[in-house]
Amino acid sequence: MEHRGVTVWFTGLSGAGKTTISHALAERLKAAGCKLEILDGDIVRTNLTKGLGFSKEDRDENIRRIGFVSHLLTRNGVIVFVSAISPYREIREEVRQRIGDFVEIFVNAPLEECERRDVKGLYQRARAGEIKGFTGIDDPYEAPTNPEVECRTDLEELEESIEKVMKKLTELGYITP
């Protein structure tokens, strides 16, 4: 499969399915011969952005750093999947402008569904006041106003979400089957 560099940014609440979709799709594209890297928010926080907290300023800096690395990879012909909550619209737009070749995927599931899926108990801890500034509970998540793709993970199967993203990447000329 031929491809060109692009950053595919999966955004949504914790537990919406960002990592599930991005990893399943990455496996398929890598098997087809695509150069692809995944920048997962949880992994990035323990390496690239270690030491940053969860204030708005720190979250924005986290996204800027992910965006910087994504831009370097994208301009060198790599498909980059970013799987990060990235709750603020303005910083996502800033990163989109910097990178250029950028496709936003809104991984959308209702808060109740995300809480039901929460294997780490983060939502429960946030509701109990043990975690402050948790996105979706006491810190806002600003949904994209015009994402290239919206995956409703409460209503569609994983394969349907993967196909929607593949179709869009093909339409935009980033991958050629």
From Swiss-Prot:
Residues the record marks as active site: 86
Gene3D superfamilies assigned to the protein according to its UniProt record, in alphabetical order: P-loop containing nucleotide triphosphate hydrolases
This protein's GO CC annotations: cytoplasm
An MF annotation (GO) of this entry: ATP binding
Pathway linked to the protein: Sulfur metabolism; hydrogen sulfide biosynthesis; sulfite from sulfate: step 2/3
InterPro entries: APS_kinase, P-loop_NTPase, Sulf_AdTrans/APS_kinase
Catalytic activity: adenosine 5'-phosphosulfate + ATP = 3'-phosphoadenylyl sulfate + ADP + H(+)
EC supergroup of this enzyme: transferase
This protein's record includes keyword Flavoprotein: no
Function according to Swiss-Prot or TrEMBL: Catalyzes the synthesis of activated sulfate.
Protein name per Swiss-Prot or TrEMBL: Adenylyl-sulfate kinase
Lineage summary: Bacteria, Bacillati, Cyanobacteriota, Cyanophyceae, Oscillatoriophycideae
